[in-house]
């Protein structure tokens, strides 16, 4: 018979209320003069890789074949309205990746989940509602997700990284 262990973390508040949906703010350093690392793609993996490189003191250079998240909106609308697909800017290519214009739900099928709390904190730091930290089914929302993605890019730029759109790596 197997023994099941439960690892439980508890925060105790005595004579005070727990803070509502607090999140950890990451202090990203200026990496303008640090060694450069090329990141191909500005989807979720590329954006989070770039932010992690900044945390580690490296300067990310993000190269994305599609357009920025707000310019993509027009191209995606053309797909629905005019049935015209831009091969370089559509649901698959562009800042934010395939999920940028999805329903905004945060979901993974991966069995190797990694540090989900840190990912949610990064989203909160960049404009997502802190409620995603405690929701059973976190949801940023279609209306907010493009702004969150843009804020992530702005953090990369503010810290000295670079982001190039409409640039292929052939």
PLM feature spans:
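Residues forming the flavin
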Residues: 1-170
């Amino acid at each position: 018979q197997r023994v099941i262990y439960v690892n439980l973390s508890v925060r105790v508040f005595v004579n005070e209320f727990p803070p509502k949906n607090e999140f950890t703010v990451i202090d990203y350093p200026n990496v303008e003069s640090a060694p450069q690392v090329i990141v191909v793609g500005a989807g979720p993996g590329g954006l989070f890789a770039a932010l992690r490189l900044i945390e580690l003191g490296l300067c990310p250079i993000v190269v994305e074949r599609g357009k920025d998240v707000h310019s993509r909106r027009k191209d995606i609308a053309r797909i629905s309205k005019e049935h015209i697909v831009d091969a370089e800017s559509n649901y698959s290519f562009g800042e934010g990746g395939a999920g940028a214009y999805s329903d905004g739900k945060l979901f993974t099928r991966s069995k190797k989940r990694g540090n989900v709390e840190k990912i949610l904190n990064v989203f909160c730091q960049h404009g997502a509602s802190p409620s995603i930290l405690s929701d059973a089914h976190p949801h940023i929302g279609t209306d907010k997700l493009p702004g969150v993605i843009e804020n992530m890019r702005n953090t990369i730029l503010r810290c000295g990284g670079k982001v190039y759109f409409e640039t292929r790596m052939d």
